[in-house]
């Protein structure tokens, strides 16, 4: 895997919970590599996560912007969080990077962005873990209350 020889089309960052994904889109053969491993191997063949990662590319194929002739390699470096949080961070990063790709015509770029917005791929899920409060066992879990 030599990323320096391939043309970098776009870069973006996606975040979810504690996971941070740095995404690079390169002109290539359509490979999806996460932390120097194939996406299938990295996500333990979890079909739901794999479908979520490929969904932004499917939107582009439905709009007939991305064809087999101009395939895109996706190189991802992801840290922190669990597998599902990482998968959602990667999905957001891929969608952001695909919005940055130069396509012929400004209407096409607006169309890509609008379709991603409608599908919810550019929406950030801002929910994070609630902090633990003193006097409690967890964020909201308290010891059992005794009246007498």
From Swiss-Prot:
GO biological process: translation
Gene Ontology MF terms: RNA binding; structural constituent of ribosome
Gene Ontology CC annotation, any one: chloroplast
Keyword Plastid tagged: yes
Annotated compartments: Plastid, Chloroplast
Family: Belongs to the universal ribosomal protein uS9 family.
Protein name: Small ribosomal subunit protein uS9c
Biological source species: Tetradesmus obliquus (Green alga)
